[in-house]
Amino acid sequence: MSQTTESPMKKISLEKVVLNMGVGKSGDVIEIASRALEQISGKKPSARNAKETQRDWGVRKGEPIGVAVTIRGDDAKALLKRLLEAKGNTVNGRAFDNFGNYSFGIREHIDIPGVKYEPSIGILGLGISVTLTRPGYGIRTRSKHKASVGKSHIITSQEAKDYLVKEFGVTVA
């Protein structure tokens, strides 16, 4: 029996995709960015508030300065395929952290397949953060007896790159 099988606990899966638009000021631009994110994701985004006052920029603490939406499950996988297609199915190798997460940006949201240009929205850029997970990662977030994930169970950047190549056919540059 020289056949080696991987443990089912080591199987990597997509946990969530977070789309974020930071516009830097409140008002109509927040509504425009919110409509753009809703057009991309099909979900209603939530406003993100400023953590501190920046007098030079005219931003007050608690004022909405960005919008974000979190997508999970099968919708996240379908959306990620569209977002990667907008980037030409390539991801920079430096976009990965030591825990299997990665981020990238899109300069113009109209590059995403299925998104049409609307003059009332204009052209906006956005940031995308992708989180990968394994079975057993729930011990970090449960309410009782929280624990850290063991060192050998953490997703490395190389494992995340391999997952992307295998699941989405992406080239890592």
UniProtKB/Swiss-Prot annotation:
Gene3D superfamilies: 3.30.1440.10
Family (UniProt): Belongs to the universal ribosomal protein uL5 family.
One of the record's GO molecular function terms: structural constituent of ribosome
InterPro entries found in the cross-reference section: Ribosomal_uL5 (IPR002132), Ribosomal_uL5_arc (IPR022804), Ribosomal_uL5_C (IPR031309), Ribosomal_uL5_dom_sf (IPR022803), Ribosomal_uL5_N (IPR031310)
Its biological purpose: This is one of the proteins that bind and probably mediate the attachment of the 5S RNA into the large ribosomal subunit, where it forms part of the central protuberance. In the 70S ribosome it contacts protein S13 of the 30S subunit (bridge B1b), connecting the 2 subunits; this bridge is implicated in subunit movement. May contact the P site tRNA; the 5S rRNA and some of its associated proteins might help stabilize positioning of ribosome-bound tRNAs.
One GO cellular component term noted in the UniProt record for this chain: cytosolic large ribosomal subunit
Superkingdom field: Archaea
Pfam families from the UniProt entry: Ribosomal_L5, Ribosomal_L5_C
Designated name of the protein: Large ribosomal subunit protein uL5
Statement: the UniProt record of this protein carries the keyword Methyltransferase: no
The organism of origin for this protein: Nitrosopumilus maritimus (strain SCM1)
Keywords: Ribonucleoprotein, Ribosomal protein, RNA-binding, rRNA-binding, tRNA-binding
GO terms under biological process: translation
Assembly and interaction partners: Part of the 50S ribosomal subunit; contacts the 5S rRNA and probably tRNA. Forms a bridge to the 30S subunit in the 70S ribosome.
